[in-house]
Amino acid sequence: MAPITLSQIDEDLKDVIQTFFEIQSAVHGYLGPETQQELVKKLKSLTVSLQTLSAHAAPDPSYVQSPPSRTGLSPADPPVQSIQLPPEIIDYVDAARNPDIYTREFVELVQKSNQELKGKMEAFASFRDVLAKEMASAMPECKKEVERVVKATGGSVDGGGCG
């Protein structure tokens, strides 16, 4: 059996939403016994649509993830089993929050962390260069070794470079 793709789940969801819309219309225009049979048919249709969606979305224990080139599936339409969402995003949706907010906050946090790390790297590089300069002037016999270490780590003994 071919794996269920994201587009298939999308179609199943559209069917469920369409059935809900039809039920809403039938309830809104309810005229009594003559529309009761139609409403019953729509409710049965909803049950079938939900069962189909549930069956397609259920985890497949026999599923083994393989590269898209081997399965012949488009990367734009991956198998449902291969999609992994962070639990935090699921919590956001469960709390009726927009998952885009989580993504934005996550990106901002990563940017802040990257800026802090960049600052630390620049501070350590500057410290390395100053330390090397002071060591070379205080211990001339070690100057060649200090220069070798500084150059290997991307620095400059004369204080002009920053790795």
Swiss-Prot record:
<keyword id="KW-0539">Nucleus</keyword>
<protein>
    <recommendedName>
        <fullName>Mediator of RNA polymerase II transcription subunit 10</fullName>
    </recommendedName>
</protein>
<dbReference type="GO" id="GO:0003712">
    <property type="term" value="F:transcription coregulator activity"/>
</dbReference>
<feature type="region of interest" description="Disordered">
    <location>
        <begin position="57"/>
        <end position="79"/>
    </location>
</feature>
<comment type="similarity">
    <text>Belongs to the Mediator complex subunit 10 family.</text>
</comment>
<keyword id="KW-0805">Transcription regulation</keyword>
<comment type="function">
    <text>Component of the Mediator complex, a coactivator involved in the regulated transcription of nearly all RNA polymerase II-dependent genes. Mediator functions as a bridge to convey information from gene-specific regulatory proteins to the basal RNA polymerase II transcription machinery. Mediator is recruited to promoters by direct interactions with regulatory proteins and serves as a scaffold for the assembly of a functional preinitiation complex with RNA polymerase II and the general transcription factors.</text>
</comment>
<dbReference type="GO" id="GO:0016592">
    <property type="term" value="C:mediator complex"/>
</dbReference>
<dbReference type="InterPro" id="IPR019145">
    <property type="entry name" value="Mediator_Med10"/>
</dbReference>
<keyword id="KW-0804">Transcription</keyword>
<keyword id="KW-0010">Activator</keyword>
<dbReference type="Pfam" id="PF09748">
    <property type="entry name" value="Med10"/>
</dbReference>
<comment type="subunit">
    <text>Component of the Mediator complex.</text>
</comment>
<feature type="compositionally biased region" description="Polar residues">
    <location>
        <begin position="63"/>
        <end position="72"/>
    </location>
</feature>
<dbReference type="GO" id="GO:0006357">
    <property type="term" value="P:regulation of transcription by RNA polymerase II"/>
</dbReference>
